[in-house]
């Protein structure tokens, strides 16, 4: 199929596709019931017609119905309507894909466990294919991936890979010293992933087991592996990962971000060189594609260039890209053959595939950041974010399939004798039991919406277009409330689809008062104000503190007419925050309707707040 209509793959804001969903769900349930009935039909039924007429049976059935009625009532009363086409402007939540929901519902009836092939033959194969989808999305020809519970687990696994691989040369020096003779400890700690994998390829299976036993999994030499460098915009899961992996929070170094909230590459190089001068190695660097609070895209290409430059000087680091939020957006740049389209051809490419309905800008720096992900050693990607599939579905992909043999807990030669395809996941991942229904959901989503411009590119293009238009809408917005003019200041041009903004009383130069106003707006526009089902505008918020962000917000502070001194006094700013994931707002009719509606809702809330 050339280009898809994304309105056909969601249940719909007003359940417009509800009849299709119900028809397909009933069809699939009927097929499952028939599958049960047709399994050795001559077997005696375990539940007889007489059983179904007994008082205890009937009472139990009625009690079950009552409990499920309560579940329905509690979910309807206590859930946030983020399916809305234009009322919800908050967290990374939106409509989920109808095919993914149906596949999850259907596969759940079999309750497959993807940790073992014997309990999930169908869905284990699906997960293997999803892992290959991830590798193809990032143009990693030798890559391998799998689904994880979430991005935090995937990040933890990325650090696990980095720690284990970095420790292998020291383990080789201990148990097979002849393999690394004449190499200093510094040289061993600065070997590339490819050099380490090439070294281990010559080992026998027994030698490899010895080396792994002496690696970081033994607890030895972990503090020798060096620092873990993250941007100030890091996700909080990295602190937990450093703790759990035994690397320690003291080994984490936060690299400053620029005014555009991307990692400062000059600061990164300076930090690495200062550490190298002290003979402190770099365990790894994290780049973020789609930061949690701002949606920004770090310059992965410049980090790769820096790594190549430093490699010539005998300094090397593992690179993990945390693309939990932004990873799926790489589909936007891939043609149907999976090729990354040149930047010079991008405008024509988007026009050919009708990606955008209005003028949308994709910065060259953002484009290059996405392009360079293919050079990372591992990448986090979350289907339950921009993949629009149900929770819980994170994911990770590694650049070289052989990397997994470094972290495996069962010798691959044992599994390969008894397990052909797909691979026995349990040997290579952090998790144990895992839902096969998740694999079915992600696999189905990837087949209905290919990971290129004709599929996910259409969906994510709609999201990016809506974000840029929403920011333009906010820029032009102002209100007159009780004789005061309320201005709206969007943060920055979004690299992706996140928009942050601040409400401010005109001529107010008191940052504390501005923060209070925006805290109150959040309280009035979220679950903090109680039941949100009747809310006409729902949003989220965040706080940029000097402790976390340094002085990167100063430019924004000054744009609002405040002084640097005011920032230094308060050292934090509260912003309203929206991940624009709704798939419908690239439609002019819908965009115009909802922007008018939420402007009215904003004005009403401001009238309630402003004294």
UniProtKB/Swiss-Prot annotation:
<dbReference type="InterPro" id="IPR021115">
    <property type="entry name" value="Pyridoxal-P_BS"/>
</dbReference>
<dbReference type="Pfam" id="PF21391">
    <property type="entry name" value="tyr_de_CO2_C"/>
</dbReference>
<keyword id="KW-0175">Coiled coil</keyword>
<comment type="subunit">
    <text>Homodimer.</text>
</comment>
<comment type="similarity">
    <text>Belongs to the group II decarboxylase family. Tyrosine decarboxylase subfamily.</text>
</comment>
<feature type="modified residue" description="N6-(pyridoxal phosphate)lysine">
    <location>
        <position position="385"/>
    </location>
</feature>
<comment type="function">
    <text>Catalyzes the decarboxylation of L-tyrosine to produce tyramine. Plays a role in acid resistance since tyramine production via tyrosine decarboxylation appears to provide a cytosolic pH maintenance mechanism that helps the bacterium cope with acid stress such as that encountered in gastrointestinal tract (GIT) environments. Therefore, may contribute to the colonization of the human GIT by E.faecium.</text>
</comment>
<feature type="binding site" description="in other chain">
    <location>
        <position position="292"/>
    </location>
    <ligand>
        <name>pyridoxal 5'-phosphate</name>
    </ligand>
</feature>
<feature type="binding site" description="in other chain">
    <location>
        <begin position="382"/>
        <end position="384"/>
    </location>
    <ligand>
        <name>pyridoxal 5'-phosphate</name>
    </ligand>
</feature>
<keyword id="KW-0663">Pyridoxal phosphate</keyword>
<comment type="pathway">
    <text>Amino-acid metabolism.</text>
</comment>
<dbReference type="InterPro" id="IPR049373">
    <property type="entry name" value="TyrDC_C"/>
</dbReference>
<comment type="function">
    <text>Also involved in drug metabolism, being able to catalyze decarboxylation of levodopa (L-dopa) to dopamine. In gut microbiota this enzyme is in fact exclusively responsible for the decarboxylation of levodopa, and thus reduces in situ levels of levodopa in the treatment of Parkinson's disease.</text>
</comment>
<feature type="binding site">
    <location>
        <position position="433"/>
    </location>
    <ligand>
        <name>pyridoxal 5'-phosphate</name>
    </ligand>
</feature>
<dbReference type="GO" id="GO:0030170">
    <property type="term" value="F:pyridoxal phosphate binding"/>
</dbReference>
<dbReference type="InterPro" id="IPR015424">
    <property type="entry name" value="PyrdxlP-dep_Trfase"/>
</dbReference>
<dbReference type="Pfam" id="PF00282">
    <property type="entry name" value="Pyridoxal_deC"/>
</dbReference>
<dbReference type="InterPro" id="IPR002129">
    <property type="entry name" value="PyrdxlP-dep_de-COase"/>
</dbReference>
<protein>
    <recommendedName>
        <fullName>L-tyrosine decarboxylase</fullName>
        <ecNumber>4.1.1.25</ecNumber>
        <ecNumber>4.1.1.-</ecNumber>
    </recommendedName>
</protein>
<dbReference type="GO" id="GO:0036468">
    <property type="term" value="F:L-dopa decarboxylase activity"/>
</dbReference>
<dbReference type="InterPro" id="IPR050477">
    <property type="entry name" value="GrpII_AminoAcid_Decarb"/>
</dbReference>
<dbReference type="GO" id="GO:1903184">
    <property type="term" value="P:L-dopa metabolic process"/>
</dbReference>
<dbReference type="InterPro" id="IPR022397">
    <property type="entry name" value="Tyrosine_deCO2ase_bac"/>
</dbReference>
<dbReference type="InterPro" id="IPR015421">
    <property type="entry name" value="PyrdxlP-dep_Trfase_major"/>
</dbReference>
<dbReference type="GO" id="GO:0004837">
    <property type="term" value="F:tyrosine decarboxylase activity"/>
</dbReference>
<keyword id="KW-0456">Lyase</keyword>
<feature type="binding site" description="in other chain">
    <location>
        <begin position="151"/>
        <end position="152"/>
    </location>
    <ligand>
        <name>pyridoxal 5'-phosphate</name>
    </ligand>
</feature>
<feature type="active site" description="Proton donor">
    <location>
        <position position="413"/>
    </location>
</feature>
<keyword id="KW-0210">Decarboxylase</keyword>
């Amino acid at each position: 199929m050339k280009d898809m209509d994304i309105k056909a793959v969601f249940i719909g804001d007003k359940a417009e596709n509800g009849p299709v969903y119900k028809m397909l769900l009933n069809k699939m349930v009927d097929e499952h019931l028939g599958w049960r009935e047709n399994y050795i039909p001559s077997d005696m039924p375990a539940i007889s017609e007489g059983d179904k007429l007994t008082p205890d049976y009937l009472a139990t059935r009625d009690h079950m119905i009552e409990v499920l009625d309560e579940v329905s009532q509690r979910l309807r009363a206590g859930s946030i309507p983020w399916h809305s086409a234009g009322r919800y402007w908050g967290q990374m939540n939106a409509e989920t894909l109808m095919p993914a929901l149906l596949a999850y519902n259907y596969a759940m009836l079999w309750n497959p466990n993807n940790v073992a092939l014997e309990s999930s033959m169908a869905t284990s194969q699906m997960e293997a294919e999803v892992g290959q989808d991830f590798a193809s999305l990032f143009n990693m020809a030798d890559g391998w991936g799998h689904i994880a519970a979430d991005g935090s687990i995937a990040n933890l696994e990325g650090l696990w890979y980095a720690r284990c691989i970095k420790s292998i040369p020291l383990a080789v020096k201990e148990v097979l010293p002849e393999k690394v003779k004449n190499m200093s400890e510094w040289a061993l700690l600065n070997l590339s992933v490819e050099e380490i994998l090439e070294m281990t390829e010559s080992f026998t299976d027994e030698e490899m087991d010895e080396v792994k036993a002496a690696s970081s999994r033994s607890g030895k030499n972990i503090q020798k592996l060096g620092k873990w460098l993250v941007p100030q915009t890091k996700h909080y899961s990295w602190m937990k990962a450093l703790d759990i992996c035994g690397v320690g929070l003291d080994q984490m170094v936060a690299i400053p971000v620029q005014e555009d909230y991307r990692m400062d590459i000059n600061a990164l190089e300076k930090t690495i060189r200062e550490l190298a001068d002290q003979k402190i190695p770099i365990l790894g660097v994290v780049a973020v594609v789609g930061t949690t609070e701002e949606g920004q895209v770090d310059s992965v290409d410049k980090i790769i260039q820096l790594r190549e430059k430093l490699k010539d000087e005998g300094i090397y680091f593992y690179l993990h890209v945390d693309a939990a939020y932004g990873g799926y957006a790489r589909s936007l740049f891939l043609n149907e053959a999976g090729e990354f389209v040149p930047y010079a051809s991008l405008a024509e490419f988007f026009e050919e595939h009708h990606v955008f309905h209005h003028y949308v800008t994709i910065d060259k720096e953002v484009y290059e950041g996405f392009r360079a992900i293919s050079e990372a050693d591992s990448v986090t990607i979350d289907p339950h974010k921009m993949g629009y599939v149900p929770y819980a579905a994170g994911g990770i992909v590694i650049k070289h399939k052989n990397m997994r043999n470094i972290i495996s807990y069962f010798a691959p030669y044992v599994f390969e004798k008894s397990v052909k395809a797909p691979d026995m996941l349990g040997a290579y991942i952090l998790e144990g039991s895992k839902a096969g229904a998740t694999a079915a959901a992600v696999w189905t989503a990837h087949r209905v919406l290919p990971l290129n411009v004709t599929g996910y590119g259409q969906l994510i293009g709609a999201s990016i277009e809506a974000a840029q238009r929403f920011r333009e809408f906010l820029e032009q917005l102002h209100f007159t409330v009780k004789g005061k003019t309320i201005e709206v200041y969007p943060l920055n041009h979004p690299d992706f689809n996140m928009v942050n903004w601040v409400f401010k009383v005109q001529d107010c130069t008191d940052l504390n008062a501005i923060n209070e106003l925006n805290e109150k707006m959040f309280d009035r526009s979220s679950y903090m104000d109680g039941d949100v089902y009747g809310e006409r505008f729902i949003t989220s918020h965040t706080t940029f503190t000097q402790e976390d962000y340094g002085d990167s917000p100063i430019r924004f502070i000054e744009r609002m007419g405040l002084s640097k001194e005011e920032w230094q006094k308060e050292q934090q700013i509260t912003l309203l925050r929206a991940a624009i994931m709704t798939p419908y707002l690239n439609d002019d009719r819908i965009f115009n309707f909802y922007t008018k509606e939420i402007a009215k809702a904003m004005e009403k809330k401001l009238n309630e707040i402003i004294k």
